[in-house]
Amino acid sequence: MKALAALAGAVFTVAACYGLGSMLDARLGARLRRYEKFPLAFVLGAAVLHLAIFAVMALQIAYKPVLIAMLSGCVAAALVTGDWRLPAPEDTKRDGPLPTAVRYLFGIVFGISATAFTALYLFNAWAPEISPDGSAYHLGLVSRYLRVHGFERVTTNMLLSFSEGVEMLYVPAFAIGRHSAAALVHFAFLVALALAVLGYGKRIGKPLAGAAAALLVSLSPIVGIDGTTAYTDVATAAIMFSVFYWIQLWDETRDSRLLIAAGLLAGYCYAAKYTAFVMLVYAVGFVAWRTRKWQPVIVLVGCSLTMAVPWIAKDWIYLHNPVAPFANQWFPNPYFYVLIEKIWMARMRTYGLANLWTLPLEVTIRGEATQGLLGPVFLAAPLALLALWSREGRKLMVPFALVFITYFGNIGTRFLIPCLPFLSLAMLIALEGVAPALALLIAFHAVTSWPTVLMRYTHAWSLSGIPYKAALRMIPEEEYLGAHHEYQWARMVEKYVPPGKLVFTLTGLPDSYTTREALFIYWGALSNDIGDALTMGWNKAWQPARLSSFILPGGKYRRLRVVQIGTATIPEEQWNIHEMRLFHRGSELPRRPEWRLQASPNPWGVQRAFDNSEATRWRSWETLRPGMWITVDLRREEPVDRVQLELSGDEWDARMRVETTGANGSWVPLAAAAEERTVRYSTSLRRSATYEAHLRGVDYFLIKDDDFGAGDYAEFSDDWGLTRLEHAYGASLYKVNSDQVSPPGVNP
């Protein structure tokens, strides 16, 4: 039954998309040919359906009956209006008959390759979903939204702040058929992409090149693994290519109604993935160049905003940042730190590769560093330059260039998928007249992309076989998933952690398989702060190590500010202050509730420099630079003769001065004598760190055996105030002994 439910959920969702798109393209006057109607109508309908589901989620009425009724309405309307039907076949001279020998040769290669890989992909998509991002992130948010029947404000996971246009289609599929249904919907986008490439080749009079390019795209190992899981990259590629396709249809007829479809899809590009919005740039530029008029451009932009603005508004309302999780420097908020964003983006630009000149080999043959490969055949990508000699080739190379530019923001192989339709067609249209060469090229690509052959030359992320028994649930779903450690961790969390409780993890979980919320150390400010405190518990380099004191001129002060004047030597270095203390005649001024504390940057964390805990610290969460400051307003003048800062050992370039306000209210430096000494704590900070996590609502830790600090948690669990509930599948689940942790008060 689970297998049938998964198939039903996917088929129902795909049918609704196709029905909705069919009705829309009929009313736009689009004269689609038989071979191109399904891919173009399906993707266009997906854009519109995603917006309807967005509205359902916003209204908090995402119940299974509501979603089924929505899908049923789309299918029924298309059937009643007759728009569901495919156009009658037409005999076009441009697609004229091929020589018999060529037809047989190409038919054999095309038929065998398409059939074999369709079976491979179908059963992999149908099998239980356990892909890294699919089961954790994409379906994690879908299952979370369905539990609350709509959108939920999530400030603890930066991944959930991205636009979720493709995931909206996973919502009804998941509600009906769970995880595999969503993966099958993505597989439908893979099919649509291949058919669209094939259709475009036929439309421009290059049927062989179109067929070969469709296989070049769809047989690529990275397309296979991505398009059969609940990722979104293949769907994004299909949406982007559809924008190009509709723009070319408009260029043939100059029917302005077709720009509505192109505009909706360009906006849907943004809803699918931020960088895909570059297709609006392409569409606007092409239409403006061809018409020299502003009215068509307004139609394009207006329709695109219909799709994009809801996602911009959602992020603005929930996170105070319309393009979260990016641009936090320009849209400051307490949820995502600037430095984490920059470190993450820097890593995405390199993936640990010392030399980016190795990228061509990495993404085509190796694939381990960039998490997937296109296939060796794409080493022939320079063939695309031959397309510049033809008008049709230049039409393809312009969007390819625009999309390819965005790739360098994240050089993972799957981020090249949107380039493949344009690149593949451009590579092969010059070979239209050399059918045997096309057949050999596709045969080579098919052989080198088949799983058993792939394993001989790479260990990159790719499909490993045809899991038909798992797909048909001849192997029980629980048994199939149980072979994956990540799934077992999720079940461990579900078993021990009470509903509503948070779990902190250094590893991440397949969130779609648990109803508990996991805080991954990297994805949000709350997790960053908890991880920082816990790391201090076992890593002495992060603990307080220096006392910087400033002897002030005698007098009374109301406002004091410590200003950073040093410059970091590495981007990761921050300004960290564990405690800022004020003294008079050797006695610390007692902290009062009326004190006003401020800091720049990170004003939200300033209290950590005044909480009397060495297991916390105010951090700039930006690279240490001159001009940063932390201020205390005593609300009245008080005698102060010393400012003392407790600094950690991982800030090497911090240099500071103390300022106060002058008679005119402006800040003026004080002639303060600086003293510095090192300190060492004899008392462990482990339990203090645990208390900080407990204080923020975290009473459970999932620690993998090879996580940093894992040995310390296991060996000194009593010192941490933890009880290990279970150790299995290479990970331990700990519970905080809340009766054993208390507010820290360790002072040097």
Region spans (language model):
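Membrane-embedded, hydrophobic transmembrane alpha-helices
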Residues: 1-94, 545-548
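Short periplasmic/luminal acceptor-recognition loop of GT-C membrane glycosyltransferases, typified by
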Residues: 479-526, 694, 698-707, 734
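Membrane-interface transmembrane helices that cradle and orient dolichyl/undecaprenyl
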Residues: 199-203, 243-259, 385-391, 431
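Disordered, acidic Ser/Thr/Pro-rich linker "stalks" and the adjacent N-terminal cap
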Residues: 544-555, 568-638, 648-653, 660, ...
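Hydrophobic, aromatic-rich transmembrane alpha-helices
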Residues: 115, 358-401, 438-443
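Transmembrane-helix signature of polytopic, membrane-embedded enzymes
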Residues: 31-41, 180-181, 197-219, 238, ...
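Membrane-proximal, lumen/periplasm-facing interface regions of secretory-pathway glyco-
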Residues: 129-140, 444-492, 509-511, 657, ...
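Signature aromatic-anchored transmembrane alpha helix within multi-pass, membrane-resident enzymes
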Residues: 107-114, 260-264, 280-284, 298-305, ...
